[in-house]
């Protein structure tokens, strides 16, 4: 009877020792990761500090200037849309035609707030796609949480934890976007 107790105590001590070693490895690795993040953040701040923060309107104006497109060409949108719809059948068979056409359908409302998108089929399609993306991200988060149990390497563990945080934040953003569309 006492032999079993000694064996179980030794086993528990062994497991506790291994857990402490693992925790020390994680702490060391985490400290190294934090130091790497600090240095990379400082480097990023040095390069980005020269740029002033801008609004969406400024970014759109800069993009228009970069592409050398004047705003008068944006007024010609109905003619451009008509040209896209009158494309020959040979081009419609091209694999790029469908993505271009779907892009043209959605680009006319790209400058609107989500709540001002007209109610109807397009809003329903957007909500359906966002909910599908959200459900896939939730499955990915679940799979990542299961993967944590089998991890032997502390670097992989840190990457999985980081990716789970990214998944959760993305899910929250998508849900808030869905709420703003409703």
From Swiss-Prot:
Report which superkingdom the organism of origin falls in.
Viruses
Per the Swiss-Prot or TrEMBL annotation, the motif Nuclear export signal is positioned at: 96-105, 122-132
Q: Where does this chain mainly localize? A: virion
Q: Does the keyword rRNA-binding apply?
A: no
Q: Name one GO cellular component term.
A: virion component
Q: Which GO terms describe its biological process?
A: exit of virus from host cell nucleus through nuclear pore
Annotated disulfide bonds: none
Sorted keywords for this record are: Host nucleus, Host-virus interaction, Transport, Virion
Pfam families attached to this UniProt entry: Flu_C_NS2
Chain coiled-coil ranges: none
Location comes to:
Virion; Host nucleus
InterPro entries, A to Z? Flu_C_NS2, Flu_NS2
Similarity comment: family membership: Belongs to the influenza viruses NEP family.
What does the UniProt function comment say about this protein? Answer: Mediates the nuclear export of encapsidated genomic RNAs (ribonucleoproteins, RNPs). Acts as an adapter between viral RNPs complexes and the nuclear export machinery of the cell. Possesses no intrinsic RNA-binding activity, but includes a C-terminal M1-binding domain. This domain is believed to allow recognition of RNPs bound to the protein M1.
Summary of subunit composition and partner proteins: Interacts with protein M1. May interact with host nucleoporin RAB/HRB and exportin XPO1/CRM1.
According to UniProt, the name of this protein is Nuclear export protein
User: Which species does this protein come from?
Assistant: Influenza C virus (strain C/Ann Arbor/1/1950)
Q: What is the lineage of its organism?
A: Viruses, Riboviria, Orthornavirae, Negarnaviricota, Polyploviricotina
As recorded in Swiss-Prot or TrEMBL, the protein's gene is named: NS
């Amino acid at each position: 009877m006492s032999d079993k107790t000694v064996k179980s105590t030794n086993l528990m001590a062994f497991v506790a020792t291994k857990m402490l070693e693992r925790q020390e490895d994680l702490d060391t690795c985490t400290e190294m990761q934090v130091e790497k993040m600090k240095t990379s953040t400082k480097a990023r701040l040095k390069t980005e500090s020269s740029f002033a923060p801008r609004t969406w309107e400024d970014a759109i104006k800069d993009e228009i200037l970069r592409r050398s497109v004047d705003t008068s060409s944006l007024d010609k949108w109905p003619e451009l849309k008509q040209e896209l719809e009158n494309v020959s059948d040979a081009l419609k068979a091209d694999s790029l035609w469908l993505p271009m056409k779907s892009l043209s359908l959605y680009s006319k409302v790209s400058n609107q707030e989500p709540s001002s998108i007209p109610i109807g089929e397009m809003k329903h399609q957007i909500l359906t796609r966002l909910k599908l993306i959200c459900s896939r991200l939730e499955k990915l988060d679940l799979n990542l949480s299961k993967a944590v149990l089998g991890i032997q390497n502390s670097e992989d563990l840190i990457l999985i934890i980081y990716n789970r945080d990214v998944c959760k934040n993305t899910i929250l953003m998508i849900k808030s976007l869905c709420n703003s569309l409703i």
